[in-house]
């Protein structure tokens, strides 16, 4: 996947960022989101399955859709691209993977430093309706198990983070946080939700301080992640794009 001449240029790099999108995992059998024919959003309206409003309106339907997606992710294995990215660690002192994917395949391939901008489908967190919570009379506190808002008298003093960690995204009724009783949901970024500020700050810092950035399989249509190659380019880094079709940045990048 990585051409020999590019490998040679990368040998002089001290900090490499690899930025990946849905195309990275397509060969592992995970459909992309935006392909007009086979993408996930070609088959279902994201407003029905990937927004806080959808979960508030029909939580079981949204949960079941994510269970179906999680089943495909669990069957998937890292492809040659994931393996090649992990091997970059053998000759580049510092490699930071920044991914828009939620499938955990970079970690499965052996990449050590992975910033997951859009979360991880294999993790769960509490769904907290902050509008409803702050509209009531109760004083909200933070549940130490799920880090969501809770009402003080709902907290279980005997529950621990390990009780949440063993709960999986699987078919059946939606589980609840063992600490505060809130419904659980996939720990992914839905439409209308902001990215984790700390995660985004780490990604920006990596892009702005790297020697080189390789962009693989991203349509570069979703902000703020799409700005990462530009941030690296504007700081003088070598930026390489590996994509089957050109993107909005292709004229400014080394395109493969």
Model feature map: region roles:
Residues 1-253:
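Conserved catalytic core of sirtuin-type NAD+-dependent deacylases
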């Amino acid at each position: 996947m990585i051409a020999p001449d590019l490998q040679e240029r990368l040998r002089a790099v001290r900090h490499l960022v690899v930025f990946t999108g849905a195309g990275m995992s397509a060969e592992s059998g995970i459909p992309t989101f935006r392909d007009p024919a086979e993408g996930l959003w070609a088959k279902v309206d994201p407003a029905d399955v990937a927004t806080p409003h959808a979960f508030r309106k029909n939580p079981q339907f949204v949960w079941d859709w994510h269970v179906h997606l999680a089943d495909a992710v669990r069957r998937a294995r890292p492809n040659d691209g994931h393996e090649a990215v992990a091997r970059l660690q053998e000759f580049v002192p510092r490699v930071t993977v920044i991914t828009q994917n939620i499938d955990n395949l970079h970690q499965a391939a052996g990449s050590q430093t992975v910033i997951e901008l859009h979360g991880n489908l294999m993790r769960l967190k509490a769904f907290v309706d902050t509008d409803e919570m702050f509209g009531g009379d109760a004083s909200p506190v933070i549940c130490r198990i799920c880090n969501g808002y809770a009402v003080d008298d709902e907290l279980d003093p005997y529950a621990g983070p390990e009780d949440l960690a063993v709960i999986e995204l699987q078919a059946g009724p939606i589980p609840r946080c063992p600490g505060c009783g809130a419904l659980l949901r996939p720990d992914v970024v839905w439409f209308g939700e902001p990215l984790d500020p700390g995660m985004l700050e780490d990604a920006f810092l990596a892009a702005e301080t790297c020697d080189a950035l390789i962009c693989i399989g991203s349509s570069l249509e979703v902000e703020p992640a799409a700005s990462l190659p530009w941030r690296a380019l504007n700081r003088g880094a070598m930026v390489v794009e590996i994509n089957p079709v050109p993107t909005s940045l292709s004229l400014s990048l080394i395109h493969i």
